[in-house]
Structures are given as C-alpha cells and as structure tokens.
Amino acid sequence: ESEQHIIDVIQPQILTLQMSRLQHAPDANVVDYMKANMEQTAAIQKVSDDACFRFLYPMVKGGVNPMRMLDKDLMTRRMQADADMMRAAYGKNRHTVTQAEREAAVEDVRPIMKALADKYGEDIQLLQMPEKAAGKEKLSCDMVQEMWAKVLALPEQKAARVIRLAVSELE
C-alpha cells in the first residue's frame, strides 16, 4: 500500500474517534487538543497552503503525513495532547454534554461567526463546504485558524463547549 493510501484511509478514522471522545473530555483537555491542532496547522501552512488545506480537510483532497513536515517537539506535543484528551474522556472527570451547554455554545460562537462573515463575506461558506475551496486553499486555512484563535481566546469553559459543538457537527 502507498503511504498516501494508508493516510487517506486511516486519518478520517482517527479524526472520527477523536471527535467522539472530545464530547466527553474535560474542558482543559479539549482546549489543549485544539491549541495543539492549531499550532500544527500553522506550522504545516508554513510548508504550503495546499498542505495546510489537506491537513485540515483530508477527505477533500487527501491528507498529509504531518511527521514529514513538522519538527519532533511539535509532533510530540500534539500526540501528548491527543493521548491526554482520549484518556481523560474515559476518566473520573468525564464530561457529559447537555442541551443547555450546546445552546450556550451557539450563543458563544455567534459573535465570532458574525465577525468572520463581516470580514470574509460569502467565502465564510468554505468553512462548511471545503469541497468548494479549490483555488482558495490559503483563504480556507486562514479562516479556520482565525476562527479557532477567536474561540481559544474565550474563557476555557466557553472555548471547550464551542469546540465540542463544532466537532459534533462533523460526526
């Protein structure tokens, strides 16, 4: 099997598992997971906008092997954040998402999405429809990072519930 084929089969499966575990991980682990993910995204975008897009949306154009693009320290931090989050999702401080939390997350994210819509106009739709982003890979990567930077600037509890809401819509 080619490395690319293996990446394209396994990455979406890992992502699906992580998204489901994020729903049960404590706030601090959820926020750390997303911070590590965004640190990795920024580093991959320095390699190329196309690599960044493939990293964020492996299902659209095929994924990338981050091990080939990132320094060992960054990969280690990311893998540690992933492992901590997955473990904590089964731990004694396991989180349960409530309807009230989901509703609060919608309110928390509304001003962020409005600010992005004001800045990017119709292109904001690429966040929901990355398959339409051909030729706009840089813009897509920039918008994703700007959105998560704004979310991660929220207090931890709010940031965690927005992250859980956003990834629950990917499941």
Indicate residue ranges for each PLM-predicted region:
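N-terminal Sec/ER secretory leader and immediately downstream segment
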Residues: E1-G62
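A cross-kingdom marker for long, charged
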Residues: G121-E171
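Structured segments of extracytoplasmic/periplasmic soluble domains
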Residues: Q13-S20, I112-K119, L154
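Extended amphipathic alpha-helical interaction segments
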Residues: A42-E131
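Extended aliphatic helical segments
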Residues: V9, V30-V31, I44-V47, V60, ...
